[in-house]
Amino acid sequence: MAVITKIEVQKRSKERFNIYIDKGQGEEYGFSVNEVILIKHGLQKGLEIDEIALGNILYNEEVQKAYLQAISYLSYQMRTKLEIEDFLRKKEVGQAIISEVVSKLLHDRYINDKEYAILYTRTQSNVNRKGPTVIKRELLNKGVQDLIITHSLQEYPKEKQIENALILIEKKKKSYQKHSFLQMKLKLDEMLVRKGYSRDVIQICLEELKDEKDDEKQQEALHYHGNKYYEKYKKYDGWTLENKMKQALYRKGFSIDEIEIFLQMKREEG
């Protein structure tokens, strides 16, 4: 049995208190607690506490400490239940305390996976223009349940997906101006898959791209790659030269007819 002899406010934190006790051998430092725990357990000078009571006080102090760490972590941005649990584990908090902290955070509505999933879907679709497949994978990695994700993705209709995909295509296709139209389409297809768009949405967007095919730019790309390969293979003669040129340009996505026209031009130049 011990008796509280003095309660002192810490100099560095006005919300924490040092508790001094006497176990029968004079006053000594006992432990420190947060203001919440001080009030919760009614700690005051003259109060007698046994080992069981002390154990409860110290346990609740650890819970409160972990709770405040979680609140601080949440102050930067919303987090999922799993993210909070992982954060506390990295802080070497015990599982029993983690469970209590998460339960309190859920009760106080500091964490809510449903609200998080909806906000995350809106942000990733409107700001980063990610497709639903990537958004779903990221939410699953954050521990959000599949049913909640399905509900949140209703915020991202197909029309919006197509709009975003077309914006991405418009931005990216400028960097493929020296590629054949076919190769540009393949690269844009790969980009949209990486961004998380469905095959259906990608096909619709690339069909619209077909209507924008620029013959002049296609010819510029053909001449760019054709001349580059001609310089590379001009040490060969006749059939060997043309065969290597055809293979290289075909791999770049140019049609047989386009390649033949270019080779005919080179024959006339020669």
From Swiss-Prot:
One of its GO terms (biological process) is regulation of DNA repair. Keywords: Cytoplasm. It is found in: Cytoplasm. InterPro entries: RecX_HTH_1st (IPR053926), RecX_HTH_2nd (IPR053924), RecX_HTH_3rd (IPR053925), Regulatory_RecX (IPR003783), WH-like_DNA-bd_sf (IPR036388). GO terms for cellular component: cytoplasm. Pfam families: RecX_HTH1, RecX_HTH2, RecX_HTH3. Modulates RecA activity. Belongs to the RecX family. PANTHER family: REGULATORY PROTEIN RECX FAMILY PROTEIN (PTHR33602:SF1). This is Regulatory protein RecX.
